[in-house]
Amino acid sequence: MVLHVITALLSIGLCYGMPPSGTTAAPTAYNGAAAQESLIPQQAHHARASLFPQQQRNPSYQTMGSYGSSLFDPSVFPVAHAPASQAGGLLGRAVARTSGGQANAGASSQNLMRSIMQNTMTGRLMGLDNQEIAHLNSVRTLGVGHATIHRLMKIDQIPSYNYYLALKNKPAQFSKAQNYLMTLNRMENHATDSQLEAMGARMLMQRNMDPDLARMVQLDAARGVYGDRLQRVLLGGSQMSLLG
């Protein structure tokens, strides 16, 4: 009896639970890509530029020549480009255009002399010619007498100048040598021959003199900087010492 009831229920379910055979739809084929898209929706792709926007370049660096032209603009240093035939000389015209040397107000003459000498030395080491060195000096020496500048620019003609350059890696000795050259340079312009000779003789006879300064004095004396008589004495003594 129970078996008949179960069979009847199954028959009723099969008749009313399934759709008619004429309306049965074919099963949809499985689409893996569609299923993945529904589970993990693709995010919109953003370009890298939106995360790291490109900055605008600084207009002052757009061209290679812009920086250099700001340093070496002819209008900044008109003296260096003036015709050489004008009266007064290159630095003379630079000094003539100043009124009291405002660029160096309060600076001592000694500091300016050192500046001229340092610029001249640097220019020589860089291979600059006299006009370029004058241009270099004119930037820092406005208001300084033309004769002073012209004299200091000739300081590299002193025989011991190259020895002085060799001391550039010894600051203490370099400073002493610089003071000596500046003193000699000044004496050459103002002192008489007898005063120069006395100065050279005094330094040559000085005991416990700095070895580098002593060598510079000897080099200059041997080239006649301190006069012919001292040169003959020094060279004669050198020859005697060499001959034993």
UniProtKB/Swiss-Prot annotation:
It is found in: Secreted. The keyword Signal applies. Residues 1-17 form the signal peptide. Its main location: secreted. One of its GO terms (cellular component) is extracellular region. The keyword Secreted applies. Keywords: Secreted, Signal. Component of the acid-soluble and acid-insoluble organic matrix of prismatic shell layers (at protein level). This is Uncharacterized protein 1. It comes from Haliotis asinina (Donkey's ear abalone).
